[in-house]
């Protein structure tokens, strides 16, 4: 890896760069140009993004944090996380990764913002897991706003909600310096609550919302698939390009246009049964059954069927490029067919 952007205007840190969101974000930042991209992950960089990165920090973020104090980052995209299902198995480890890692990066951004009198932007992908509700509430809630049902049922959701609050604190109230006669420059924290994200170019990683893409990958390969949630289970989803679009739109917008720190974004909502129907339409020989796993079902049942993203639409012009039909017809299915030779 070399310094491919020696005259770059922005120094950018992307943690969790080897994940689905991280790889897509690095590719888009490199495509835009003008960024010197530093990445961090516990895994080596995949070949797809190696030539787009100036430097990669390999290792556990919590233990590597001192290294980052030597860098002059303009923007931090903190994507590294222990996801929902894994976090339920290893709760203490999830808290260490999700909370301690986030807090240490927030402290870094706060320190650099104050010392060098230059605001560091801190972009944080939160999740619909930050919500928590009973199944009857889920069925009756309709479009859920950012300030509703904020009692998450999972460690991952608790971590995300708490980190949203930490971000607000470090942005506005850190050390109560906002009360000083001459307040210091503070970091600029911005968060998105993502729905289930689906990439056409990477394999599902076993996440709690991955039953939809897993179903279609199995159908394309002629493999049977037992879906781990009920047929009527419904949550919101988004194509990965729209996730990256929303993240960069929120990065670019002026702070004066933002009325909130945390924003919902949405694209379309589907039941598991509707995913099955799409799979059968494209792959008529698909063998799909429903065998709910009580724990994973319980997690998804605590998430809203859909969210209200009107704040994002109003404040910074958010609008997804992919609705449900264009997602399947123009984005996801063409790549699935290509991957498995079904053209």
Task: Describe each region flagged by the PLM.
Residues 12-32:
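N-terminal Rossmann NAD(P)H-binding glycine-rich loop of SDR-like oxidoreductase domains
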Residues 61-97:
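NAD(P)H-binding glycine-rich loop region in Rossmannoid oxidoreductase-like domains
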Residues 87-88, 149, 193-206, 214-238:
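A conserved pocket-lining segment of Rossmann-fold NAD(P)-dependent short-chain dehydrogenase/reductase
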Residues 89, 93-104, 150, 154, ...:
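Glycine-rich NAD(P)-binding loop of the Rossmann-fold in SDR/ketoreductase-type enzymes
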Residues 103-155:
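Conserved Rossmann-fold NAD(P)-dependent oxidoreductase catalytic core, especially the SDR/UDP-sugar
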Residues 133-136, 151-189:
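Active-site Tyr-X1-5-Lys
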Residues 161, 185, 197-213, 240-241, ...:
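Glycine/proline-rich active-site loop of Rossmann-fold NAD(P)-dependent oxidoreductases
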Residues 223, 228-231, 236-343:
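C-terminal substrate-binding subdomain of Rossmann-fold SDR/epimerase-dehydratase oxidoreductases
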């Amino acid at each position: 890896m070399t310094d491919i952007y020696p005259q770059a205007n922005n120094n950018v840190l992307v943690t969790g760069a080897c994940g689905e969101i991280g790889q897509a974000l690095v590719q888009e930042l490199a495509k835009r140009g003008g960024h010197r991209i530093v990445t961090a992950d516990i895994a080596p960089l995949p070949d797809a993004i190696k030539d787009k990165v100036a430097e990669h920090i390999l290792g556990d973020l919590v233990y590597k944090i001192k290294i980052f104090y030597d860098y002059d980052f303009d923007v931090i995209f903190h994507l590294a996380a222990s996801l929902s299902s894994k976090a339920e198995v290893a709760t203490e480890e999830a808290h260490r990764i999700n909370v301690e890692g986030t807090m240490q990066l927030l402290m870094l951004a706060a320190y650099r913002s104050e010392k060098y009198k230059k605001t560091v932007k801190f972009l944080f992908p939160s999740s619909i897991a930050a919500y928590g509700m009973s199944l009857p509430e889920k069925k009756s809630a309709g479009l859920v706003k950012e300030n509703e049902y904020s009692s998450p049922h999972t460690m991952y959701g608790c971590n995300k909600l708490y980190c949203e609050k930490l971000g607000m604190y470090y942005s506005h109230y850190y050390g109560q310096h906002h009360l000083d006669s001459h307040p210091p420059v503070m970091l600029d924290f911005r968060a998105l609550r993502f729905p289930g994200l689906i990439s056409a170019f990477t394999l599902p990683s076993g996440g709690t919302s991955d039953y939809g893409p897993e179903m279609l990958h199995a159908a394309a390969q002629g493999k049977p698939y037992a879906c781990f949630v009920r047929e009527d289970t419904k949550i919101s989803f988004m194509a990965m390009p729209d996730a990256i679009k929303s993240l960069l739109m929120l990065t670019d917008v002026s702070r004066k246009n933002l009325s909130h720190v945390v924003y919902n974004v949405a694209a379309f909502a589907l039941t598991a049964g509707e995913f099955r129907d799409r799979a059968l339409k494209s792959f008529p020989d698909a063998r799909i059954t429903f065998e709910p796993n009580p724990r994973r079902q319980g997690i998804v049942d605590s998430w809203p069927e859909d969210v209200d993203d009107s704040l994002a639409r109003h404040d910074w012009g958010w609008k997804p490029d992919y609705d449900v039909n264009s997602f399947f017809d123009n984005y996801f299915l063409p790549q699935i067919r290509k991957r498995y030779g079904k053209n």
